[in-house]
């Protein structure tokens, strides 16, 4: 027997229609390339998304076609999210920080038919266009009078392209599991892998995020996380779904312009990766500024450090919510919300709790297994491979020959983790980054977080390097606040009270910059490759 409820055909365009009907005048704010602040609202975004969809359909693009965006966080990119996917095509968000070879591979692998290009990235596409046989048209995200001279095929400005579109376009009904968006993984040594999201999975993910992050309807959200990065953590969907004010910084992600935008738009909730917040906090510190309106910040992408948590809390009275997920998870899997129990703790214990990745949102299941696949207890001590499953988690990679999950539907995240008796998950390390020294394990993440607590350390990276006696030993790479080396012994003395003696790095190397990937994550494999023989040659 089945239930007697009405059939529902999911289409993410229903979200922007909902926003138009219930929150038509809610603002969508963008800082444009010129620095100008552009203001629109959900009603206008919806109407322009319809116009885009109708023109794409008129041009012969159909359900299942893959259309790419190479764009910044602005209102036009938000329109692309709905206009492309709403008419049944697939929105493929390209990362403009990709190495050219990776960009060529991804575009050709996806078989993108159109690329919507921001003006600053036109030269990048001109350099690659002869290697992209699949692309039929380039639509430049600008007004007609701003269209640059270009050799790109069939180039046209976005505003001219949608000018004759039908603002009364009716969104089509789609198949139950119709594809919606495409994003490729980053930070791997091989070719990136595509993750194909569905309309249904994105809508379910948005519902879960609203509850899992306890977002209130009067929030003004600063969306620093890029729209190209795992669907901006779902904000383009649950923002309009809940009628939230969206504030997008465009290209200017440095501390001063971010602070200016936060103050100007009374931002209450901000989303971003740790490296962005390091820049904002540094600007505030150097200029005696306080984040007056911000109540909460959601941090993900890489592990939250105690130094960032402490400064947000003690200096700015901002609550930090750590979130965890990955491209294969749409991306949100866990969140670490402030609970009444945590509020009663002393500061040291509360910080220790907040540094955990958190508990799974409804719909996500977690477990930790040993090397043989046996489930380990949730005791906060048993480390193992973190496995996940749920309705917005990958089944198989795009165009892959086989599933990426085991026979019971569990996906191996590649993380080494523990889960405690209350369900809080803590990532100890990536399986490929954990350091095995003398038969014991050293967490590179824990060592990095300890190092950035030093007042003169801006950023730290730890990698395990082959050692003739101990199998592997850590090297600590440091970027200082001044950019100049400091006394290594001061670092070791500081760490000695934070970690076990045998965890202390055998070598500390000062660098001007650490290698980051296209989404801001540390590229440890670059340092591992460069210094692989360091201990063997000594």
Report the location of each language-model feature.
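Conserved beta-loop-beta connector loops within the AMP-binding
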Residues: 360-387, 421-422, 484-488, 523
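Structural core segment of the AMP-binding/adenylate-forming
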Residues: 15-17, 58-59, 86-160, 482-484
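Conserved AMP-binding/adenylation subdomain of ANL enzymes
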Residues: 203-220, 228-268, 283-284, 334
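Gly/Ser/Thr-rich phosphate-binding loop
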Residues: 267-272, 281-351, 365, 372-377
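Conserved pre-ATP/AMP-binding loop-to-beta segment of ANL
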Residues: 24-27, 139, 162-184, 191, ...
């Amino acid at each position: 027997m089945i239930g007697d409820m009405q059939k529902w055909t999911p289409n993410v365009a229903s979200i922007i229609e909902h926003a138009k009907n219930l929150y038509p005048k809610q603002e969508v704010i963008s800082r444009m390339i010129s620095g100008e602040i552009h203001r629109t609202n959900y009603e206008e975004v919806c109407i322009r998304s319809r116009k885009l969809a109708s023109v794409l359909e008129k041009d012969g693009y159909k359900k299942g076609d893959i259309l790419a965006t190479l764009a910044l966080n602005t209102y036009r990119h938000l329109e692309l999210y709905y206009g492309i996917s709403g008419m049944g095509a697939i929105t493929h968000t390209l990362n403009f920080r990709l190495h050219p070879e990776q960009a060529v591979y991804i575009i050709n692998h996806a078989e993108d038919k159109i690329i919507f290009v921001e003006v600053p990235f036109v030269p990048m596409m001109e350099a690659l266009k002869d290697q992209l046989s699949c692309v039929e048209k380039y639509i430049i995200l600008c007004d007609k009078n701003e269209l640059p001279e270009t050799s790109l095929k069939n180039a046209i400005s976005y505003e001219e392209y949608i000018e004759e579109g039908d603002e009364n376009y009716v969104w089509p009904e789609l198949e139950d599991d119709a594809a919606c968006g495409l994003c490729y993984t980053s930070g791997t040594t091989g070719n990136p892998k595509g993750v194909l999201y569905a309309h249904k999975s994105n809508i379910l993910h948005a519902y879960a995020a609203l509850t899992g992050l306890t977002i209130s309807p009067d929030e003004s959200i600063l969306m620093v996380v890029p729209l190209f990065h795992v669907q901006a953590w779902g904000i383009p969907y649950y923002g309009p779904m809940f009628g939230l004010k969206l504030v997008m910084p465009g290209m200017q992600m440095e501390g001063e312009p971010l602070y200016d935008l936060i103050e100007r738009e009374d931002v209450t909730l901000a989303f971003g990766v740790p490296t962005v917040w390091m820049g904002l906090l540094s600007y505030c510190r150097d200029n005696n500024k306080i984040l007056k309106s911000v109540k909460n910040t959601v941090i993900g992408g890489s592990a939250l450090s105690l130094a960032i948590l402490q400064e947000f809390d003690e200096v700015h009275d901002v609550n930090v919510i750590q979130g965890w997920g990955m491209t294969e998870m749409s991306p949100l899997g866990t969140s670490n919300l402030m609970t009444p129990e945590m509020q009663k703790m002393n500061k040291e214990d509360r910080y220790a709790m907040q540094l955990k990745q958190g508990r799974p949102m409804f719909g996500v299941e977690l477990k930790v297994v040993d090397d043989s696949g046996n489930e380990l207890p949730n005791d906060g001590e048993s480390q193992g491979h973190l496995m996940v499953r749920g309705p917005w988690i990958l089944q198989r990679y795009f165009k892959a020959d086989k599933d990426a999950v085991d026979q019971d539907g569990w996906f191996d995240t590649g993380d080494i983790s523990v889960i405690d008796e209350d369900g809080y998950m803590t990532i100890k390390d990536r399986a490929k980054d954990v350091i095995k020294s003398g038969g014991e394990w050293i967490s590179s993440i824990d060592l990095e977080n300890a190092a950035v607590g030093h007042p003169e350390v801006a950023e730290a990276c730890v990698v395990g390097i082959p050692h003739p006696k101990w199998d592997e030993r850590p090297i600590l790479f440091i970027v200082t606040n001044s950019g100049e080396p400091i006394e290594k012994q001061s670092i070791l003395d500081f760490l000695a009270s934070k970690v076990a003696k045998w965890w202390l790095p055998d070598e500390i190397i000062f660098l001007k910059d650490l290698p980051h990937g296209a989404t801001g994550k540390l590229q440890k494999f670059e340092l591992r490759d460069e210094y692989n023989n360091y201990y063997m040659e000594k």
